[in-house]
Structures are given as C-alpha cells and as structure tokens.
C-alpha cells in the first residue's frame, strides 16, 4: 500500500470527480483530513490552491492527501475547464465569495468555479471566519447572493466566537448528497434509531442497550446516496446523532411519526430504533427509597411504533428490524417471515445478537421470498439503499 493510500469505507462518490478548491482561510489546515475523507468514499479529486492558501498549507501536504498533482497557477492544460461532478470550495473566504459574486476570474480557482457553474454543476461553498466577519451585513449579502445563484452554502454553528469549518465527515456527507441527488430511485425516507426508556421514578428508568449505531449508519448512507432523509433519534452511545427529532420514550417515537407525516408522507419508513415493548404502569412521583426491600414494578404494553405507522401511513413501505438471542439462524429467519406478515413490513432486517458482536453475518434482509445475507455493516447499508432505490424506480 502506498503511503498516501486510504481505506475505502463507502462507494457514494465512486466514479465521481470532485474539484477541491482551497483558498486562504486558516481552515485550509483541515485540507488533509477533508481530502482523505473524500477519497475514503471513492472520489477522484482535482485540486487547486490559491496563492493565499499556499501561505497556510503547502502544496506538498495537499498533494499527499489528495493523491494527485496540485494546481497552483496557470498552466497550459487548464484543468479548471475539465468539468467535475461538483466543485467544493473549502474554506471559502469572504474575498472568494466576493470574487464569485462579481464574476472575477483572476486565478485558476475562480476559473474552476465559473466553468462548473456554467456547465450546471453544483458548487458547495464552506465559509469559515470570526463571528464579527460572518455577521457583517456585507458577508450576509454575499451568502444570500450565492444561494440566489443556485450555489450551496454549508456553515457550522458559532463556537468560541468563530464559524469554524464543519468536520470533514459533515462536508463529505453534504458533498455526496449533492452529487447523488436526483438519482433514479431517490426517495423521501424517515429513519428511526437509538434506544428508548420509560421512568420508574424521577431518577430511574427501564431502558434497553441499543447504541443507535446501525440506524445512524443506515441514515448516513442513505443521505450520502441522495435520498431525502429525516431522522428520529432516541438515546445513543457516542456522537451518533443527526440533526433530527429527539425521541426519548416509546410515546415520543409515536408522536414523532405523526409529526413527520404532517410535513409530508415519506416513501419509506426505516424502523431501526429499539422501542420498548413494555413500560411501567405507573411512575412514582418521588424517588423510591433505596431502602425498599419489596419493590414491584407493574408493566403494560408500550405504544407500538410500527402499528401506529401502518395505521397513519398505510400505503408506504416499511423496513423494520428484528433482533433475537439464543436461537438458530433458521429459527431467526422463520420469525422474520412471521414478523413481516404480522406487522405488514415490506422488508425485515433480522439479526442475532452474536452477529452484532462479530460472530457470524451482520444480519439478513428478508423481503418477499428473498433472503439476502449481509456480511458487514457496509453490506447492510448498501442492501437497504438498493432495495429503497428499486422501490422508487
């Protein structure tokens, strides 16, 4: 393996050309991480640096990260005229925004933006600067002009008095979504993931051990592949939350489904959340004493998310998940088939707990008479995306 090689983790940019334009903001120091994240998803990168960018990060470092020659000035082959699938300007300084707004084309970077815009390719601008500069009315006018021209702007919330450049994973996810938007089969998808809990008293809960990882990966992959994804997020372990609807309890999950439907019916519901089957009948108004020696908790069936969705959205597709322990693979598949009939699911992702722990396949996708073995998380995500795309075609 070459020193500059990367481990491929996805194919959402496979065969896609991304022209990375690096301008002279301090966030140019993030170019190495950003370029390598693009490559991990299969992108073929062309890269152009402005003179000001070279004062912050060297072309040598950028060339190592991108695995290609860095364009740093005018040349006879004019690589900026080779139209890519998307131009990514990161960082996009205020000076750069001003040039694009005014049509200035005084270097190869601005020519790359102009050529791609003229060819109807998406332009993604990632400005980063101090809050005072960002909030200046002139900057806001420039950003509004960019959007009016049809360009896309990605910013982060204010932190430490600055609009810092978003994490490479966030930028690449948006890049993938723009490049793949409008693909045949693109659908509006609601993904539920994470655990749920229900209170016994004000400080104690009944919950489950779901980390939310699988649903997060599915939602992430669907968004990268150009689907319009809405997420409902329960409790998760680690940084696994998209910006979406927060849902702590089974009732919250049910309410979230109704909220989503009010904004427009999804084409597909992906139910990867671990929703409690049972919840306490009554919650104690006060903390139960730790000295109690004869504590009993009565349980009742919790609201069933899948039944609610089938009732309020009868014509849409549902992909549900089923996790089992201590049974054989054949028994798992039998239960998955029964689950599809009982719940009206169009497909079921069936898992054994030992598969989640690395012992055996990651899961099985059961739909109709078809059973697909999913050996890895990547295959699981790709399998779900392929099925959704086939429904939307």
PLM feature spans:
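A cross-family phosphate/adenosyl-ligand binding-site feature
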Residues: 1-393
């Amino acid at each position: 393996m070459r020193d500059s090689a990367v481990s491929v983790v996805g194919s959402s940019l496979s065969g896609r050309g991304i022209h990375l334009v690096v301008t002279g903001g301090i966030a140019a120091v993030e170019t190495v991480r950003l370029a390598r994240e693009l490559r991990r998803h299969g992108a073929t990168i062309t890269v152009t640096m402005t003179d000001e960018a070279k004062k912050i990060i060297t072309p040598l470092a950028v060339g190592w990260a991108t695995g290609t020659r860095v364009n740093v000035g005018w040349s006879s082959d004019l690589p900026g005229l080779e139209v890519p699938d998307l131009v990514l300007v990161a960082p996009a300084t205020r000076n750069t925004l001003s040039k694009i707004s005014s049509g200035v084309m005084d270097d190869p970077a601005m020519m790359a933006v102009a050529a791609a815009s003229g060819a109807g390719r998406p332009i993604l601008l990632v400005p980063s600067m101090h809050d005072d500069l960002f909030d200046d009315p002139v900057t806001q006018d420039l950003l509004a002009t960019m959007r009016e021209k049809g360009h896309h702007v990605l910013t982060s919330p204010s932190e430490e008095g600055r609009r810092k450049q978003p994490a490479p994973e966030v930028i690449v996810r948006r890049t993938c979504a723009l490049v793949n938007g409008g693909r045949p089969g693109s659908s509006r998808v609601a993904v539920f993931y994470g655990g749920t809990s229900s209170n016994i008293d004000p400080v104690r809960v009944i919950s489950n051990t779901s980390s939310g990882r699988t649903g997060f990966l599915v939602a992430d992959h669907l968004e990268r592949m150009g689907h319009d994804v809405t997420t409902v997020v329960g409790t998760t372990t680690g940084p696994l939350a998209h910006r979406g609807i927060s849902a702590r309890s089974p009732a919250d999950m049910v309410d979230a489904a109704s909220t989503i439907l009010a904004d427009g019916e999804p084409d597909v519901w992906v139910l990867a959340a671990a929703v409690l089957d049972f919840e306490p009948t009554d919650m104690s108004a006060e903390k139960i004493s730790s000295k109690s020696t004869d504590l009993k908790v009565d349980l009742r069936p919790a609201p069933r998310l899948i039944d609610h969705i089938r009732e309020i959205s009868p014509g849409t597709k549902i992909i549900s998940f089923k996790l089992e322990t201590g049974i054989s693979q054949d028994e798992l598949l039998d239960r998955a088939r029964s689950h599809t009939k009982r719940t009206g699911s169009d497909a079921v992702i069936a898992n054994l707990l030992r598969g989640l722990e690395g012992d055996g396949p990651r899961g099985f996708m059961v739909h109709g008479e078809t059973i697909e073995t999913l050996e890895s998380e990547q295959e699981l995500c790709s399998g779900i995306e392929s099925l959704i795309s086939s429904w939307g075609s």
